[in-house]
Regions:
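A conserved short coil-to-beta-strand element within the FAD-binding core of flavoproteins
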Residues: 213-224, 236, 324-335
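Glycine-rich dinucleotide-binding loop and its adjacent helix/turn
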Residues: 125-139, 206, 212-214, 233-284, ...
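Internal hydrophobic alpha-helix adjacent to the cofactor/substrate pocket in enzyme cavities
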Residues: 73-79, 279-290, 388-399
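Rossmann-like dinucleotide-binding cores of NAD(P)H-dependent redox enzymes
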Residues: 167-206, 280-326
């Protein structure tokens, strides 16, 4: 049998397609291979079961290879057989738990070595390959738990607490659950992220012990009459102290569709969010430019090389302007004045400027000495989906 996909260690993203690559991205090539062999051929790489079934029925391939979806939801095959598709927790191809090897310019691996060796875990399923660390155990005493913030961390904590036998009240100040992950899931290539938000919303309704209060902002933590309080209020976007910064569009505002942009768009900040915005703008036919102070794009540890190398290669192949080691001097109505690594200032003509320079924790004011108050997710320390979900388990298991 041939288990076929694409890629080499120089183009690792073909063998482990991130969310930026289309579904079933290897199918055409693998189907071509079958024309030249007389043994079964299996295709892997973001395969969709319905598409794979059609390809198998048509004789194009003999089987579908799946790995990451089993990490996200080990019961997904059973759920498919039982026609419980909406119960399947979708893999979002983030690689944050299963292939946690990150790299940037001049560094072979920027991830902690102990963490790098922990392969085959899952960012969105804390129990996967961590059954001795993360597991559901009924609480010795049922408690009233108040969770402030209905983002991914708050929803995950609510589910774990409910499974352990607690009564949960989840407060969300907006009209919908999802938090900042709604913005993160907005790009066209993030369909699985949007599916994950929908999964969480459905899952919460299955537990009578969880009460969700939308459009309910908690301003005084003392108003929460609970045995334990979990603060999951997320983070706020950073700003940079340069003239004209008020002319910029915050990354979250752009992703939420609050502001339209023109053809030429400069993104200040070459981290993951900034690069994903640039990628989305290019897919829309616009002309993005990235300005980054560091010597490479996406230097934050914990972001898989398969994801970052795809974006770097994509920008290079498609001649997307990327200005590294470049600082912003001023933002004007018609562009951005920057200073390059050679010390020379120049202007980048822009219809709009998007600011994507990270976040700061935004916990609700509270007594830090109160042992019954717990801060999780980005409200505690800005991280990624993996740190948010695993951190929710770390707290919820102790209550």
């Amino acid at each position: 049998m041939l288990n076929a996909d694409n890629g080499t260690y120089d183009s690792w993203y073909w063998a482990h397609p991130p969310m930026y690559m289309p579904q079933n991205c290897n199918l055409e090539d693998v189907a071509h291979i079958k024309n030249f062999v007389d043994i079964p051929v299996v295709c892997a790489g973001r395969m969709e079961p319905d598409v794979a079934a059609e390809a198998i029925a048509a004789g194009k391939i003999d089987g579908m290879g799946v790995a990451r979806q089993f990490l996200a939801d080990p019961q997904w095959i059973t759920k498919m057989i039982e026609d419980r598709i909406e119960d399947i927790k979708p893999c979002i191809c983030c690689h944050s738990g299963c292939f946690n090897f990150s790299s940037s310019k001049g560094h072979y691996n920027t991830q902690d070595l102990k963490d790098t060796m922990g392969l085959a875990r899952c960012a969105i399923n804390a129990e996967t390959m961590q059954s001795k660390k993360h597991y559901i155990e009924k609480a010795k005493k049922a408690k009233k738990i108040a969770i402030i913030g209905g983002g991914i961390g708050g929803m995950e904590a609510a589910l774990v607490c409910a499974k352990r036998g607690h009564k949960v009240t989840l407060y969300e100040k907006s009209h919908q659950l999802g938090g900042v992950f709604i913005a993160a899931a907005a790009p066209s290539f993030k369909e699985k992220d949007r599916d994950l938000i929908a999964w969480y919303r459905r899952e919460l309704t299955k537990y009578p012990s969880i009460e969700v209060k939308l459009n309910c902002e908690v301003k005084n933590i003392e108003d929460c009459k609970a045995d334990e309080i979990i603060i999951a209020t997320g983070a706020r976007a950073n700003r940079i102290p340069v003239p004209g910064v008020e002319k910029t569009i915050q990354a979250v505002d752009y992703l939420m569709g609050n502001q339209e942009v023109g053809e030429n768009v400069t993104i200040i900040g070459g981290g993951l969010t900034g690069c994903e915005i640039a990628y989305e703008l290019f897919l829309q036919g616009k002309k993005p430019t990235i300005v980054e102070m560091q010597d490479d794009l996406i230097t934050t540890p914990g972001i898989c090389l398969a994801n970052t190398s795809f974006l770097r290669d994509f920008f290079e192949a498609n001649k997307v302007p990327v200005h590294l080691e470049t600082g912003v001097r001023a933002i004007e109505d018609d562009g951005v004045t920057v200073k390059g690594k050679d010390g020379v200032e120049f202007k980048i003509a822009s219809d709009n400027v998007i600011l994507s320079v990270g976040y700061k924790p935004m916990p609700l004011e509270h007594n830090e000495k109160d042992k019954h108050i717990h801060v999780i997710g980005d409200a505690n320390k800005v991280g990624n989906l993996r740190t948010v979900i695993w951190g929710a388990w770390d707290v919820a298991m102790k209550l």
